[in-house]
């Protein structure tokens, strides 16, 4: 869709929009807000109030404007959100929406208030819904794809999907993982493991770590299916860090099936969890550029993951990939890696090497700046 850039006012003003987020989208927007502000742009971030509490947009050099963009459509909530976005877009040189809900409402707000303002959309997720919901989401995706000036896909499959839905311009826009936060205190692997394992577990018990929202996309039930096949003295302890709507069901399975697994809840000490882990597992139905995968490989922790979405291109040969939805294959891969010290050492060494091939936060910000320049003709 052709747009005439907004009249320049000296300083380029980028408005970043997101819906509720407790994962990679919020982290990425925080990184962009900080990087763009450092390059001299005026940056406004629009999203639910809790996202500022989680990610500290206000402390990134950006102005934060609360806009309650709900996870699901609602006539009243959407109308209110569109009204707030119209006001936030009043001086915008460009709007950059992250995710489908944010993109749809941003498009509506621009069409009724600032039709000449370019719209960039970063696509972070695949449509994994079924039935009527899938068809409705596809209609929304098609509208966004056709109306946005540019779609940036976090993985190659998302770029291909945007093009199939009618996007005139769709490009790869990798989402870089931020550096792992510094440890709050220097603790040894043994000290962290002792805290996590407790007094009832052997000190050398293998630890399998999984991190993410407890939602169907992450498919932690597949990990529990695999864990049900690990019995005996070398059975690993599965630690799952995260929170979400599937928490009750997962906890119920762990208890009823007597699985050697534990839910840790939301954690901010991923660096220490990685220090304690012998292996990281991603059991997802789909991922783009998984932050957990990036963190594991950077930290030199062996990774076993499902071969879905953007994961194969992200990890290359530095991780073990298994078919999605196959608990037997997942269980076998985990057991094989845990049983082979040499293989673990190979994967641990390959991870940081693979990570060197990824764009860092500075490169990601530079790409976005280039896109903004192209669409606005400024700077």
Model-identified regions with their sequence ranges:
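Nucleotide-activated donor-binding/catalytic signature segment of Leloir-type glycosyltransferases, i.e.
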Residues: 251-267
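Short His-centered aromatic/hydrophobic patch
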Residues: 97-103, 123
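A short, active-site helix/loop in glycosyltransferases that binds the activated sugar's phosphate group
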Residues: 148-172, 179
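Aromatic "clamp/platform" in nucleotide-sugar-dependent glycosyltransferases that forms part
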Residues: 285
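A conserved mid-protein helix/loop that constitutes part of the nucleotide-sugar donor-binding site
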Residues: 26-34, 206, 210-229, 245-251, ...
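Short hydrophobic beta-strand element within catalytic cores of glycosyltransferases
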Residues: 302-305
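N-terminal strand-loop element at the rim of the active site
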Residues: 11, 15-79, 158-163, 244-245
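Conserved acidic donor-binding segment of nucleotide-sugar-dependent glycosyltransferases
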Residues: 317-328, 336-342
């Amino acid at each position: 869709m052709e747009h005439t850039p907004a009249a320049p006012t000296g300083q380029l003003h980028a408005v970043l929009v997101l819906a509720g987020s407790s994962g990679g989208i919020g982290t990425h927007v925080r990184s962009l807000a900080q990087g763009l502000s450092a390059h001299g742009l005026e940056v406004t971030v629009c999203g639910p109030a809790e996202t500022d509490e989680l990610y500290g947009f206000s402390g990134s050099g950006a102005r934060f404007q609360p806009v309650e963009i709900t996870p699901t459509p609602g006539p009243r909530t959407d109308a209110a959100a569109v009204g707030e976005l119209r006001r936030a877009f009043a001086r915008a040189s460009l709007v950059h929406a992250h995710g489908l809900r944010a993109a749809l409402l941003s498009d509506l707000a621009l069409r009724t208030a600032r039709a000449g303002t370019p719209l960039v959309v970063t696509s972070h997720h695949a449509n994994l819904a079924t039935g009527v919901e899938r068809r409705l989401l596809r209609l929304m995706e098609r509208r966004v794809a056709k109306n946005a000036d540019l779609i940036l896909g976090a993985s190659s499959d998302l770029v291909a999907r945007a093009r199939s839905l009618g996007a005139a311009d769709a490009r790869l826009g990798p989402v870089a993982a931020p550096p792992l936060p510094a440890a709050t205190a220097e603790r040894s692997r043994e000290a962290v493991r002792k805290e996590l394992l407790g007094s009832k577990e052997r000190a050398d018990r293998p630890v399998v770590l999984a991190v993410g929202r407890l939602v169907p996309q992450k498919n932690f039930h597949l990990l529990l299916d695999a864990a049900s096949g690990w019995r005996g003295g070398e059975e690993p302890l599965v630690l799952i860090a995260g929170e979400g709507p599937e928490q009750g069901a997962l906890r119920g399975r762990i208890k009823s099936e007597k699985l050697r697994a534990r839910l840790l809840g939301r954690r901010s000490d991923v660096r220490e969890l990685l220090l304690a882990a012998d292996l990281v597992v991603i059991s997802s139905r789909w991922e783009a550029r998984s932050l957990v995968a990036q963190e594991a490989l950077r930290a030199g922790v062996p990774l076993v993951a499902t071969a879905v979405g953007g994961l194969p291109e992200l990890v290359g040969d530095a991780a073990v990939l298994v078919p999605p939805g196959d608990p037997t294959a997942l269980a076998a891969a985990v057991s094989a890696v845990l049983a082979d010290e040499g293989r673990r050492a190979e994967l641990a060494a390959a991870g940081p090497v693979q990570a060197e091939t990824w764009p860092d936060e500075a490169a990601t910000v530079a790409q976005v700046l280039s896109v903004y320049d192209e669409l606005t003709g400024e700077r």
